[in-house]
Amino acid sequence: MQVLYKSTRGKGETVTASMAILKGLSEDGGLFVPTEIPKLNVPVEKLAQMTYQETAYEVMSRFLTDFTEDELKNCIANAYDEKFDTKEIAPLHEADGAYFLELFHGATIAFKDMALSILPHLMTTAARKNHVSNDIGILTATSGDTGKAALAGFADVPGTKIIVFYPKHGVSPIQEKQMVTQKGDNTYVVGITGNFDDAQTAVKKMFNDQALAAELNEAGFQFSSANSINIGRLVPQIVYYVYAYSRLVGKGTVKAGEKINVVVPTGNFGNILAAYYAKQMGLPINKLICASNENKVLFDFFSTGTYDRKRDFILTTSPSMDILISSNLERLIYRLTGENAEKCAELMQALSEGGEYTITEDMKKGLADFYGNYCSEAETKEAIHSVYKNSDYVIDPHTAVADGVYRKYLADTDDHTTTVIASTASPYKFTRSVMEAVEDETESMDDFALADKLSEISGVKIPKAVEEIRTAPVLHDTVVDAPDMPAAVKKILNIVRD
């Protein structure tokens, strides 16, 4: 069965998987979605015997149908190798009555590594398949983790240049240090004076700017994206939910076919959308639990059916979720409309022009798969403290939001179905927030001293990703206002000169 990709807004052309990965965004501003969700059709008992790499092939080959077996297996082998510090790639850790799916064992100690380790290989393979002669300019907005993972993935990849925009005052010190010390002749990091939504909106505008596209083409470039708007980011994320379920079956924790709950700390909606797609493929998932921080636009949407971005933007200790315009929700909205691209485009236009939209009662019925809630900053801190106290297990603030929301779900439903919590970042990325929750005396210590202390109390070695940046020199120090982002891109790509 060939799976093709079409736009959520209906005006763009239907394309192959490789072309969707190259384009990133459809020309009508919509996101690429598969023409149908393929079924997994592999016995779970068989999946339970597979490695992560073998599972990845089983899942991804069903979505990326124009890649040959050799091409895809080659991409997978190059992605999931010794860059990860465990052979399991994404191990499960049982703690405090749940199973934490550790997605932070890659090069940059965040879940973004799971997809961004393979995206450069998918993209360069796709370029070859489609006889693309232009170099690819990767434009990425980051709320903290995507940036470093994308930089690490694309560093020194021939035929690419990657430009990452991040909110100068909206990421953790370690997140920023990881980005601004990035090596690679084709890597560029630019701070902006606005927030993540400003960066993401400007990146999307550049994708849809036909005049800019013509200038790029003349200079021998074309844009693509490493953000989760790219289907090449989303498909690899489905893999780890399938892998987690097969591990639970393999260990005898659940029987084949028995349902589990999945909790995902959510900002841009990509990670939980991957779990939703896994469920559509046939993975036995009961509830998809969407955990928000104080930027609770998604919780309000699940509660009321109205998505309203007209609110204050709050900086929290879980910065990767500090988002008011949740881009991947558009893919769910498209499914909820019954794949009515015209209706989806109308709702997205309402969001763009008026800052809000409301879904119909019929569409609301499709949200039955989801449970949404949020955690305050105090509740997030308490969750880190509580899991550590009960299980000697240290979690980062994003995972803590998920844990806190899971406790609320239990209180609301008394549903004790086996539950997997997506653990999206290493606590070492957020040492100050984590240590403030588990220890009293932290104020006088810098972030690296806190990392040493965290290692001491947790018994977990400091990851290489943190050790490497301790003394690394700053290589990127450009800061611009959000409206000046296109000019920065042109300068980097040598389309204009000083």
Segments (PLM) and residue ranges:
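PLP-dependent amino-acid enzyme catalytic core
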Residues: 1-498
